[in-house]
Amino acid sequence: MEKHYHWLGRSGGYGVGYGAPASVGAALANRDLGRFSVSIQSDGDLMYAPGVLWTAAKHKIPLLAVMHNNRGYHQEVMHIQRLSNFRNRLPNMDGDMGPVGTSIERPDIEYHKLAESMGWWAKGPIKDPAQLGPALKEAIAVVKSGQPALLNVWTQPR
């Protein structure tokens, strides 16, 4: 990255609610400088602080949030698997790999509807990659007009 503002960076809180508030804060800082802000927002992370969507809409903070909706807290899954491998044991009490971690499905969260209910322009769920380009074009126009936009993009669960 050539400029310090091209990338928000990492925090020890990544995956536990850091992403959305940090992105809205960065977009607020960028707003008066005319910089276009994009957040690749994970679904589990947003669930820690969904009220930040209202804050961005209320204060007209232009931000393009592209939801990486894999329907799970997969940082948790990867951590459990990593620790299990390190300790040479399987990650559940039944002695097989079985399900680990927390999925966010049944019911699936309609992030685009959540964002719309808080004043965002939103579209989704986007499940077909061919739909992503046109949706991005629409969302970019909305953000350039000074409003936040969210695309609920379904990705492959890990």
Task: Please give the residue ranges for each predicted region.
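Thiamine diphosphate
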Residues: 1-157
